[in-house]
Amino acid sequence: MAAPRQIPSHIVRLKPSCSTDSSFTRTPVPTVSLASRELPVSSWQVTEPSSKNLWEQICKEYEAEQPPFPEGYKVKQEPVITVAPVEEMLFHGFSAEHYFPVSHFTMISRTPCPQDKSETINPKTCSPKEYLETFIFPVLLPGMASLLHQAKKEKCFERKRTKFIACDFLTEWLYNQNPKRAGEPFTEFFSIPFVEERLKQHPRPPIPLSLLLTEEEAALYIQSFWRACVVRCDPEIQELRQWQKKLREAKHIHQQVKIFWAKQEQKVKCKMEDDAVPAAKMKIPSS
């Protein structure tokens, strides 16, 4: 059997006597300094209080054990992307100040690039990214900016339905901003040749009148309809309308109107025939 563990002498403290006179006379207690305690303390005996809970500690330890990248993954060093000003992206003939009304752009430092980049890139052999950045975006971005300004004017961001069609506006803008048509007058969307041919083969349904009217015109229509409705609800007006209806039925007004228009059509037909007879009698000069 193992021997019982002995307690060091410097840990033992003297207890005061339990006599009745202890309240008046106390036995002095020897004080022991902290520096004299040189007991070896193991790591499992003392644990520091942590602010994190157990779950956070487990997650932190698991993340520390995991590698930063999966096996077989290679970090690709991508080149530094420089931002070019919008003015250099536009073709000749486009005004960046007109479509981007900003006094100046805050640009980062960049390496100088050749001015005629579009001339050195072959559109048939270049990559899709180079083709978009060189031939598509310089033309399309100003059109998209104008499209957003026009959509704001048409209140597309405020209403659920409008007469504004974004594709039609962009087609019209690109057609009129074509450098090959420099100096030619403005052409409306429905007057563009390929648009006319397309609409002949695939006609569009008519746009509702509520979308074509302006706010002032729509207000006049609504006010006139409401006033007429209020007037017709008057009892005296209703009585007058009933009397007029009975009068039309008694005198056969509808039948008389049909006879009148039939006579008018007959007169017009006879007049057209009389005008056609002298034209047929005219001799055509021989060549």
From Swiss-Prot:
Species of origin: Homo sapiens
Encoding gene, per UniProt annotation: IQCK
Stated name of the protein: IQ domain-containing protein K
Taxonomic lineage: Eukaryota, Metazoa, Chordata, Craniata, Vertebrata
Domain of life of the native organism: Eukaryota
